[in-house]
Swiss-Prot record:
Gene that this sequence comes from: CCAP
Identification of the protein by name: Cardioactive peptide
Positions of the pro-segment in this chain: 24-49, 64-155
GO molecular function, one term: hormone activity
InterPro entries listed in its UniProt record: CCAP
Residue ranges, compositional bias (Basic and acidic residues): 141-155
Biological source species: Drosophila melanogaster
Membrane spanning residue stretches: none
Reported tissue expression: Central nervous system; most neurons exhibit coexpression with Burs.
GO CC field: extracellular space
Cysteine amide: residues carrying this PTM: C60
Purpose of the protein: Cardioregulatory neurohormone that increases heart beat rate during adult wing inflation; has no effect on beat amplitude. The effect of CCAP is both ino- and chronotropic.
Signal peptide: 1-23
Organism ancestry: Eukaryota, Metazoa, Ecdysozoa, Arthropoda, Hexapoda
Compartments, record wording: Secreted
Length: 155
């Protein structure tokens, strides 16, 4: 009789604990819906804000599928068709370029650029040749080692 009484008391205590925990969970859930009463409501921002859509073509905030401005080439094409060519402006620009190229300072810079380009090409060719020679030496050395191994194996 005592064992059955102990078992029933333990079951009753377990049931009381389960009911209390269920009540506390319900109270927390009810408070969870009311964020103003939550103790961390001022500390943590509970609302998740989506980041704007970003890509390389349009930037951030809009997608490519949205209608946008016409391509730049259409604007340029229309401007060229509407405006007649100004030959005077074009000829002035060309004459300025010719005058600039005739100056000695520009000629000196052009010569320096060309000489640096030639030096760069010479360095590239020299490095290629050095690479070829090193590869050739490695191949010859590998062939000698292979021959020595074959001679050792044949003896």
């Amino acid at each position: 009789m005592r064992t059955s009484m102990r078992i029933s008391l333990r079951l009753l205590a377990l049931l009381a604990c389960a009911i209390c925990s269920q009540a506390s969970l319900e109270r927390e859930n009810n408070e969870g819906t009311n964020m103003a009463n939550h103790k961390l409501s001022g500390v943590i921002q509970w609302k998740y804000e989506k980041r704007p859509f970003c890509n390389a073509f349009t930037g951030c905030g809009r997608k490519r599928t949205y209608p946008s401005y016409p391509p730049f080439s259409l604007f340029k094409r229309n401007e060229v068709e509407e405006k007649p060519y100004n030959n005077e402006y074009l000829s002035e620009g060309l004459s300025d370029l010719i005058d600039i190229n005739a100056e000695p300072a520009v000629e000196n810079v052009q010569k320096q650029i060309m000489s640096q380009a030639k030096i760069f090409e010479a360095i590239k060719e020299a490095s290629k040749e050095i690479f070829r020679q090193k590869n050739k030496q490695k191949m010859l050395q590998n062939e000698k080692e292979m021959q020595q191994l074959e001679e050792r194996e044949s003896k």
